[in-house]
């Protein structure tokens, strides 16, 4: 089922029937792109200044109405806003006419009217009344910010809403050069011809079955496309320049994530080391001790601690912590000499 494009109500007199509107048609036209045969890149469109032949940026394009030769009235967004009709969310029935009296070329786009649960009774009442009287309802409805004239018709169990062209949008038939239908005139039809044509019409008459009629041009073209696909006669599309940048942008995002992850890991490592300074200091002393002979370890303990402090680049506050140990060592040496 097609999607709902509008919600509102049918109104006539004091009757209000809640309904939704669904498209009753769909386009089956093949979507073909324009390509440059040299590299199979898509071909875009540009807006060209007809005087200079140069492309025009969007910011410099305005809309204007030509009221005389080379004379224009410019229109801005405010002009269009003031011209827009208010969306009333109603299908306002203004009159009923004989359904057979509407010329088919007035019809434009068909829609299905479907009642919601609150409107089922009123919908059935309007449908049955129009069916019995053979009438069509003429209504006004606002769709996509534009007011439309519409004809509501009975079709099976449903009510169908056809948007219509206004009278000034339809060219008058009087402008055509048509033969007179008077029998016996050179431009008219003779009785014998009418009789034979009537017999031919009867022989060709059949029930209306729209499924048996198809767009043969579309079907043949689609069959040709499928043949080319099956035989491998396809071409790789060259992506536009802006699409080529997409992978590089993705790579930058991935690299940034990797850098952030490394930064978080380094930050966690530093936090862990700051929380356990004693454990970090001890391995440094042991490593220095393993590099020195046993005799030198006993002879110069202060120098080793100073070297260890230099390697680990301690803050001033932590370097000062070695001073008491050095003074204690000197004091112990003096006491030994005194003894």
Curated annotation (Swiss-Prot):
Example of a GO MF term: double-stranded DNA binding
Start and end residues of each Ku domain: 10-187
Keywords from the named record: DNA damage, DNA recombination, DNA repair, DNA-binding
Bridged cysteine pairs (disulfide): none
Region (Disordered) residue spans: 230-251, 263-339
Biased composition (Basic residues): 278-289
Biased composition range(s): Low complexity: 290-310
InterPro entries: Ku70/Ku80_beta-barrel_dom, Prok_Ku, SPOC-like_C_dom_sf
Superkingdom per UniProt: Bacteria
Family indicated by similarity: Belongs to the prokaryotic Ku family.
Entry function: With LigD forms a non-homologous end joining (NHEJ) DNA repair enzyme, which repairs dsDNA breaks with reduced fidelity. Binds linear dsDNA with 5'- and 3'- overhangs but not closed circular dsDNA nor ssDNA. Recruits and stimulates the ligase activity of LigD.
Known partners and oligomeric status: Homodimer. Interacts with LigD.
Protein name, as recorded: Non-homologous end joining protein Ku
Source organism of this protein record: Cupriavidus necator (strain ATCC 17699 / DSM 428 / KCTC 22496 / NCIMB 10442 / H16 / Stanier 337)
């Amino acid at each position: 089922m097609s999607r709902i494009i509008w919600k509102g109500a049918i109104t006539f007199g004091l009757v209000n029937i809640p309904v939704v509107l669904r498209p009753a048609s769909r386009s089956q036209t093949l979507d073909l792109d324009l390509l440059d045969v040299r590299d199979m890149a898509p071909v875009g469109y540009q807006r060209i200044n007809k005087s200079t032949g140069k492309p025009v940026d969007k910011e410099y394009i305005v809309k204007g109405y030509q009221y005389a030769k080379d004379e224009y009235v410019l229109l801005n967004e405010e002009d269009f806003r003031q011209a827009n009709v208010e969306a009333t969310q109603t299908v306002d029935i203004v009159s009923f006419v004989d359904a057979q009296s509407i010329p088919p070329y007035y019809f434009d786009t068909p829609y299905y009217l479907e009642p919601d649960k609150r409107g089922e009774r009123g919908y059935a009442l309007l449908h049955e009344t129009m069916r019995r009287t053979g009438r069509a309802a003429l209504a006004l409805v606002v769709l996509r910010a534009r007011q439309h004239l519409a004809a509501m018709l009975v079709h099976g169990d449903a009510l169908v809403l056809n948007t219509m062209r206004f009278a000034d949008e339809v060219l008058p038939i009087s402008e055509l050069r048509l033969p007179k239908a008077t029998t016996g005139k050179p431009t008219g039809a003779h009785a014998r011809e009418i009789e034979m044509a009537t017999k031919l019409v009867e022989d060709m008459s059949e029930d209306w079955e729209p499924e048996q009629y198809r767009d043969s041009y579309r079907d043949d073209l689609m069959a040709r496309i499928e043949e080319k696909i099956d035989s491998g006669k396809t071409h790789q599309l060259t992506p536009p320049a802006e699409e080529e940048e997409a992978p590089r942008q993705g790579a930058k995002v991935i690299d940034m994530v990797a850098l952030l992850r490394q930064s978080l890991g380094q930050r966690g490592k530093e936090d862990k080391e700051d929380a356990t300074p004693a454990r970090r200091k001890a391995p440094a002393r042991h490593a220095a001790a393993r590099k020195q002979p046993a005799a030198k370890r006993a002879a110069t303990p202060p120098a080793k601690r100073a070297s260890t402090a230099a390697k680990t680049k301690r803050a001033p506050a932590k370097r000062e912590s070695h001073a008491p140990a050095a003074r204690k060592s000197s004091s112990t040496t003096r006491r030994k000499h005194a003894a």
